[in-house]
Amino acid sequence: MTASTPSNVMTLFLLRHGQSELNHENIFCGWIDAKLTEKGKEQARHSAELIEQYCKANNLRLPQIGYTSRLIRTQQTIETMCEEFKLKPQLQVVYDFNKIKLGDEFGSDDKDNMKIPILQTWRLNERHYGSWQGQRKPNVLKEYGKDKYMFIRRDYEGKPPPVDLDREMIQQENEKGSSTGYEFKEPNRQIKYELECSNHDIVLPDSESLREVVYRLNPFLQNVILKLANQYDESSCLIVGHGSSVRSLLKILEGISDDDIKNVDIPNGIPLVVELDKNNGLKFIRKFYLDPESAKINAEKVRNEGFIKNP
C-alpha cells in the first residue's frame, strides 16, 4: 500500500557526493577538484534508485530542483542521478542571489517536464582544508598528533593552517602536474570561479573552520533554497554537497549545538531525508537515512579516516 507524505511537509534529500579519487586515497580533498571513482558513480546511481523508490512509496514527486557545489564531484553525482531519474539537468552557477533563472516550466504541475534546474554555488563547497589539502590523512595525523588532528577535523572551531595559493593552486590554464612538490592542486580560481571573482562581495577562503562553513552557507540556504521552496510550494528538492557542507546544513536546520556537531559524520553516497514543516516556517520535523545500516557503518569509517586504511 502506498503512503502519502503530508502536504505540509517539504522533503530535502541531502547527499554527500559519491566516492572521489582522493576519498579513495585517504587524502584531504577540500577545494581540489577530484572526480568520482567508478564506485562513486555507482553510489550515485544507487542513491537515485533509493530516492525514486521512496518517492513512489510515499506518493511524492521526484525532486523538482537540485543544488550542488562548484566542485566536479558533486556535479558528476547529480548528473548521474538525473540520468537515472530520466531528467535533463539545467546547470546554472549562482554568483548573485538576484540573478537566478529557473525557466517558465519550473513550479508547474506539468508531469511531462523532463528538465530540472541545478543551481551550483561555491557556498556548498567542501570546507577549505588550508595547507592540509592534498596531504594524506595518516601523514597529517602523524605530524599533528591525535588530539590536535581530531580537534581541527571535528571541532566546530578547529581550523587548519592557511593554504599557500602560490604553491598549491594551478597558476595558469594549461599547467600540468606540479613543480613545487604538491601532487594535487586547487583549480586556478580566476578560471574556475570567474563569475564569483567578478562579484566583489565574495571573498573565497584559504582555510576554514566548520563555523566559517556554516557562516558562508547559511545565506544561500535562507535566500535561495528555503525561499524558493516557499515561493513555489515545492514538495521536494535534492542537495548534493560534501561532508562539511551537509553537516553545516544539518546544524542550521536541526539546531545542533556547537559541541554536538563534532559527533556528526556524513558517509558518501547515502541519501538523508530531512522533513520540514511548511506550515511552521519550514521548521525541522525529523531526519532519517534511506539506508540506515550502511549509513551507520560508513559514518564510522569517516570518523576513523587517517587511523585506518581505506577499503
Swiss-Prot record:
Disruption phenotype: Sensitive to sodium dodecyl sulfate. Substrate binds at residues 16-23, 29-30, 73, 126-129, 137, 153-154, 243-244. It is found in: Cytoplasm. Gene3D superfamilies: Phosphoglycerate mutase-like (3.40.50.1240). GO terms for biological process: glycolytic process. The active site is at H17 (tele-phosphohistidine intermediate), E126 (proton donor/acceptor). Its EC number is 5.4.2.11. The record marks H242 as: Transition state stabilizer. SUPFAM superfamilies: Phosphoglycerate mutase-like. GO terms for molecular function: phosphoglycerate mutase activity. Pathway: Carbohydrate degradation; glycolysis; pyruvate from D-glyceraldehyde 3-phosphate: step 3/5. It catalyses: (2R)-2-phosphoglycerate = (2R)-3-phosphoglycerate. One of its GO terms (cellular component) is cytoplasm. Keywords: Cytoplasm, Glycolysis, Isomerase. Could be non-functional. Belongs to the phosphoglycerate mutase family. BPG-dependent PGAM subfamily. Present with 2020 molecules/cell in log phase SD medium. This is Phosphoglycerate mutase 2. It comes from Saccharomyces cerevisiae (strain ATCC 204508 / S288c).
